[in-house]
Amino acid sequence: MGVRFRQKLMSGGATQNGSFCHGQNQRGVTDAPSFADAADGLSFGIDLPPCAEGPGLLLTADGGRYQGTLFGAQGYGEGELVFTTGMMGYQESLTDPSFAGQVLTFTYPLIGNYGIHAGASESSGVWPRGVVVRHAMHQPDHRHSIAPVEDLLRLHNVPGIQGIDTRSITRRVRELGTVLCVFGPEEDEDLLRSRLKEMTSPDLEDLVEQVSISSPVVLNPGALDVLDQPLPRLGALDCGIKFNILRNLCKHFEVVWCPPETSFDILTNEYQIDALFCSNGPGYPAHTGKATMARNTLAQAVQARLPVMGICLGHQLMGLASGLQTYKMRYGHRGANQPVVDLKTGRVSITSQNHGFAVADPDAGMLAAHPSGACSPPGENLHGAEVTVRFVNANDRTVEGLDLVGHPSFTVQFHPEACPGPHDAAPLFEQFRDIVDRSI
């Protein structure tokens, strides 16, 4: 039941009873579509598959062996082992499409103490292929809780393991880099080792295709501003977009939520957009699938001098379109406490981030790189605009944002919508609206 329900809730399908319908209360909007929230099945009382239990074992490709106890859905968890440092916001992290293909370790020792809340997810699915925690709370204490976290995992057929020394895992990943892993019943150790030996990197998969919407839809048709004037129309390329990004965009634009392969001609001729946005998402930025299609659309938009904003993977795709390389980081930035420096103003913002790849600095090169040396091949500038680094990470000096000189376009590696996380960078959405207004 969990697998079928997860497939039904993929971000491409509108539903009459979905929790996500941000255009519903906007001025001028009379018929806004709604979309399923990952926790809707818990609200509807859908029967859940059996819960995993008993001794579990987690193995890493570099020889690590960790014992724990299984929870969540039955089955095997396997993927790239990563960690996130957020103390809260586990529901938002579990439903963030950028975690597709990964086994997510929470460094905070207690996960699930306030349960799962209706309408608080960031997408229609749970995307990690496994979850690792020190302790999962089975009896949450919050008036708005509808279920414990393990029920959300069962609903979406995602296995978990607890009782693990997550501090040891975090140190291992920080020192040696992200690594493939597998976990399951301890009695299946031989099978686990066999699965680990045969496993291939999720970076080889077209993860963007797995998490993106299947057909275009206008989220807030007819949206008006406070003066009853039509909002500018924005095309939002979905590479794995979070609901809270869409909420923020709908405050400033009439949003056309589009698949990543949507061509520039369709966006301009059929939907007549005034600006373009490219979202966050999972996987290898230079993958030849849907990510490359979105990159080409970004380049065409810049050539046409259309205002463009990119976040996270959208930032990396703009870097590739600008002739810069992208590369795999040692352990990435995943958490809600990453300091970012604006090189233009000197201001430091604390930001929420979730990425394992970065854009190479034009001068300093590939900072905080993974030991594997994985990176995209050198490319050409597809749009012809000069690019400068606008933001850098205060900890490791990696690139956190780009400005396109002489063009109404910019990108950031961090998440200004910050769900979860601090809101220091939230004004970037309003700044982009100002850029669009000046360009129309």
Can you annotate each of these PLM segments?
Residues 347-406, 440:
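Catalytic beta-strand/loop cores that center a nucleophilic Ser/Cys/Thr
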Residues 270-362, 421-431, 435:
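Cysteine-nucleophile active-site neighborhood
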Residues 70-72, 109, 354, 404, ...:
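Residue-level structural signal for beta-strand termini and adjacent loop
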Residues 401-439:
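A glycine-centered loop/beta-turn motif at secondary-structure junctions
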Residues 159, 233, 307-309, 325, ...:
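Proline-centered loop/turn at the N-terminus of a beta-strand
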